């Protein structure tokens, strides 16, 4: 892997870490209410969590919360944490403590992206999923995001090798074919309810892969934006976060993004839509803001 690839991804993840500890508290309150009767609680390395450098929180179909960190994998059952780290005898199959992202496939298996591989949990052991480039040669690369698509495939976002896919019964992960194959440095993706794939490049440009495979590079309202994150609510509205120009909204059925005036020009890193459809906004050096799309009210560090 080229050093530039690793540096770009690490820089992006370090920005995320500046507020992710606070975000854990809110996500636990919002996604695990059935497991936690008490008020929100902040977890950190002094209180059960294996590291303060956390990159993703994921709730599986059984309600368990999985937390990816730079020092192992954490599993929370509503009462206690279990920490899984790389073992010297490789008994658990975890080949790195540097875990970036988590999702779950259609069979209920946990899928992890690390700094050098893709792993899948088979029973009680993680197994490596071979990653093959466009020439079908095996690679080891930095996985920045894993996401389950509507057709059941797992989309694997990498830094340097573009988007790859793992089919549900496949034993390997392959480069996504079509026009998107030419994209290499990708920051984040989102598949919307129409099965279109929104792609944020590491340079902040937003693209869209249509269901027929065609790649759209001109998206109205985003021409000059440095985009950071993208989410869709349960009504089909798409929120687009930018680096220094606030949040833009693509209403369901619309063709152009428009700026949400009430949010202003916040320096945004990540956004998250809660179950009650509020927008949680993580900002670089400014903590968390919460935007209510019904009232238009923006709350600072609730």
Per-range role (PLM):
Residues 1-302:
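Carboxylate-rich, polar loop motifs that coordinate divalent cations or form catalytic acidic clusters
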């Amino acid at each position: 892997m080229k050093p530039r690839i690793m540096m770009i991804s690490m820089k992006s993840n370090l920005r995320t870490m500046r507020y992710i500890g606070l975000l854990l508290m809110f996500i636990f309150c919002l996604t695990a209410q059935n497991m936690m009767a008490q008020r929100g609680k902040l977890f950190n390395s002094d209180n059960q969590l294996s590291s303060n450098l956390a990159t993703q929180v994921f709730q599986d179909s059984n309600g368990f919360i999985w937390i990816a960190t730079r020092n192992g994998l954490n599993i929370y059952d509503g009462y206690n944490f279990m920490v899984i780290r790389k073992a010297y005898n490789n008994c658990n199959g975890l080949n790195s403590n540097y875990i970036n992202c988590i999702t779950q496939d259609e069979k209920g298996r946990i899928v992890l992206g690390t700094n050098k591989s893709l792993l899948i949990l088979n029973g009680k052991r993680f197994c490596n999923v071979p990653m093959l480039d466009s020439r079908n040669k095996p690679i080891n690369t930095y996985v920045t995001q894993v996401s389950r698509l509507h057709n059941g495939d797992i989309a694997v976002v990498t830094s340097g090798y573009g988007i790859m896919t793992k089919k549900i019964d496949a034993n390997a992960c392959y480069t996504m074919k079509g026009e998107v194959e030419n994209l290499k440095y990708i920051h984040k993706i989102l598949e919307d309810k129409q099965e279109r794939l929104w792609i944020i490049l590491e340079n902040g440009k937003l693209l869209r892969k249509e269901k027929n495979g065609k790649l759209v590079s001109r998206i109205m309202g985003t021409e000059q934006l440095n985009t950071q994150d993208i989410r869709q609510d349960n009504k089909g509205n798409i929120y687009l976060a930018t680096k220094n120009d606030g949040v833009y909204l693509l209403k369901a059925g619309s063709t152009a993004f428009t700026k949400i005036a009430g949010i202003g020009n916040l320096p945004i890193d990540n956004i998250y839509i809660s179950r009650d459809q509020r927008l949680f906004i993580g900002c670089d050096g400014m903590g968390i803001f919460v935007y209510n799309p019904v009232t238009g009210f923006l709350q600072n560090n609730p």
